[in-house]
């Protein structure tokens, strides 16, 4: 019985060796060298054709795309609003006596102004006039200067280095999100409301106006030095002591081709945020 098992094992081993290489026929793994060469050539041609077809279709598709402007923009037709300084859950909380936390807010404002309002390669433009006709066919579009001093006490210039956070009257910057090709009609401006009756709101520039000279926006690649217009809102509670919690909603008004109310998108033309001021 044991001898039969040994013979069966030797036969199986011999069959495997012959399958790997058969010296009588010269076959390797059941195929001759010419058969292996033909099948490898077939797969080389087949996958080479597939790769070439894929490359060709990608090249044809890329010819239909503009390097500066997205082809499909219908899903983002109206801009939203956003505030600065940015915070988790759009809740800005600070203490007038906490210098370390206040420093982080001041650092944000300083960094923000430095990187968004440098006058390098910017030019003076005519107020309330969109620059469109002179921009056609130009590779790098003109960018208008934003006068930081128009933000009044929220500009952080001499005498207002703390942006109102040291005395409990903080400044919040509101901006409209960028959309390529957007041209607001009318006189767009931002207005904020709150259910709290004990606060005063001041807008800079006056009436929260957004100047048309900053539009249209042509995209990051073409409008390299574009500066976004800002509206600063200075919030002053009537009670200067204790803790104040204020919920505000800022909306975009004055432009008939822009929306500020959509149940499916709470940021479309508006933004809600909470402000907590502590002693």
Swiss-Prot record:
<keyword id="KW-0812">Transmembrane</keyword>
<keyword id="KW-0739">Sodium transport</keyword>
<feature type="topological domain" description="Cytoplasmic">
    <location>
        <begin position="1"/>
        <end position="35"/>
    </location>
</feature>
<dbReference type="Pfam" id="PF00287">
    <property type="entry name" value="Na_K-ATPase"/>
</dbReference>
<feature type="disulfide bond">
    <location>
        <begin position="154"/>
        <end position="171"/>
    </location>
</feature>
<dbReference type="GO" id="GO:0030007">
    <property type="term" value="P:intracellular potassium ion homeostasis"/>
</dbReference>
<keyword id="KW-0472">Membrane</keyword>
<feature type="disulfide bond">
    <location>
        <begin position="192"/>
        <end position="250"/>
    </location>
</feature>
<feature type="glycosylation site" description="N-linked (GlcNAc...) asparagine">
    <location>
        <position position="198"/>
    </location>
</feature>
<dbReference type="GO" id="GO:0005890">
    <property type="term" value="C:sodium:potassium-exchanging ATPase complex"/>
</dbReference>
<dbReference type="GO" id="GO:0006883">
    <property type="term" value="P:intracellular sodium ion homeostasis"/>
</dbReference>
<dbReference type="GO" id="GO:0001671">
    <property type="term" value="F:ATPase activator activity"/>
</dbReference>
<protein>
    <recommendedName>
        <fullName>Sodium/potassium-transporting ATPase subunit beta-3</fullName>
    </recommendedName>
</protein>
<keyword id="KW-0325">Glycoprotein</keyword>
<dbReference type="GO" id="GO:0036376">
    <property type="term" value="P:sodium ion export across plasma membrane"/>
</dbReference>
<keyword id="KW-1015">Disulfide bond</keyword>
<comment type="function">
    <text>This is the non-catalytic component of the active enzyme, which catalyzes the hydrolysis of ATP coupled with the exchange of Na(+) and K(+) ions across the plasma membrane. The exact function of this glycoprotein is not known. Some specific sequence of the beta subunit can modulate the activation of the Na,K-pump by extracellular potassium ions.</text>
</comment>
<dbReference type="InterPro" id="IPR038702">
    <property type="entry name" value="Na/K_ATPase_sub_beta_sf"/>
</dbReference>
<feature type="disulfide bond">
    <location>
        <begin position="125"/>
        <end position="144"/>
    </location>
</feature>
<comment type="subunit">
    <text>The sodium/potassium-transporting ATPase is composed of a catalytic alpha subunit, an auxiliary non-catalytic beta subunit and an additional regulatory subunit.</text>
</comment>
<feature type="transmembrane region" description="Helical; Signal-anchor for type II membrane protein">
    <location>
        <begin position="36"/>
        <end position="56"/>
    </location>
</feature>
<keyword id="KW-0735">Signal-anchor</keyword>
<feature type="glycosylation site" description="N-linked (GlcNAc...) asparagine">
    <location>
        <position position="191"/>
    </location>
</feature>
<keyword id="KW-0915">Sodium</keyword>
<dbReference type="InterPro" id="IPR000402">
    <property type="entry name" value="Na/K_ATPase_sub_beta"/>
</dbReference>
<comment type="similarity">
    <text>Belongs to the X(+)/potassium ATPases subunit beta family.</text>
</comment>
<keyword id="KW-0740">Sodium/potassium transport</keyword>
<keyword id="KW-0633">Potassium transport</keyword>
<keyword id="KW-1133">Transmembrane helix</keyword>
<keyword id="KW-1003">Cell membrane</keyword>
<feature type="glycosylation site" description="N-linked (GlcNAc...) asparagine">
    <location>
        <position position="239"/>
    </location>
</feature>
<keyword id="KW-0406">Ion transport</keyword>
<keyword id="KW-0630">Potassium</keyword>
<feature type="glycosylation site" description="N-linked (GlcNAc...) asparagine">
    <location>
        <position position="147"/>
    </location>
</feature>
<keyword id="KW-0813">Transport</keyword>
<feature type="topological domain" description="Extracellular">
    <location>
        <begin position="57"/>
        <end position="279"/>
    </location>
</feature>
<dbReference type="GO" id="GO:1990573">
    <property type="term" value="P:potassium ion import across plasma membrane"/>
</dbReference>
């Amino acid at each position: 019985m044991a001898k039969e098992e040994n013979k069966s094992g030797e036969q199986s081993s011999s069959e495997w060796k012959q399958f790997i290489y058969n010296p009588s026929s010269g076959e390797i793994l059941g195929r001759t060298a010419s058969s292996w060469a033909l099948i490898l050539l077939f797969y080389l041609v087949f996958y080479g054709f597939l790769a070439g077809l894929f490359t060709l279709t990608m090249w044809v598709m890329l010819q239909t795309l503009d390097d500066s402007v997205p082809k499909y923009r219908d899903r983002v037709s109206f801009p939203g609003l956003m505030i600065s300084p940015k915070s988790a859950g759009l809740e800005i909380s600070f203490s007038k006596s906490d210098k370390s936390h206040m420093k982080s807010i001041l650092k944000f404002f300083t960094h923000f102004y430095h990187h968004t309002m440098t006058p390098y390669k910017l030019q003076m433009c005519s107020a309330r006039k969109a620059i469109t006709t002179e921009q056609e066919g130009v590779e790098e579009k003109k960018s208008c200067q934003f006068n930081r001093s128009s933000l009044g006490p929220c500009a952080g210039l001499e005498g207002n280095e703390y942006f109102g956070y040291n005395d409990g009257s903080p400044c919040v910057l509101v901006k409209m999100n960028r959309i390529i090709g957007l041209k607001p009609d009318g006189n767009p401006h931002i207005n904020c409301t709150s259910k709290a009756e004990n606060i005063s709101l001041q807008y800079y520039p006056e009436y929260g106006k957004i100047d048309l000279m900053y539009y249209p926006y042509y995209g990051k690649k073409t409008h390299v030095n574009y500066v976004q217009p800002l509206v600063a809102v200075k919030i002053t509670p009537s009670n200067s002591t204790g803790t104040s919690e204020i919920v505000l909603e800022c909306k975009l008004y004055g432009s008939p081709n822009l929306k500020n109310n959509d149940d499916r998108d709470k940021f479309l033309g508006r933004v809600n945020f909470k402000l907590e001021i502590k002693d």
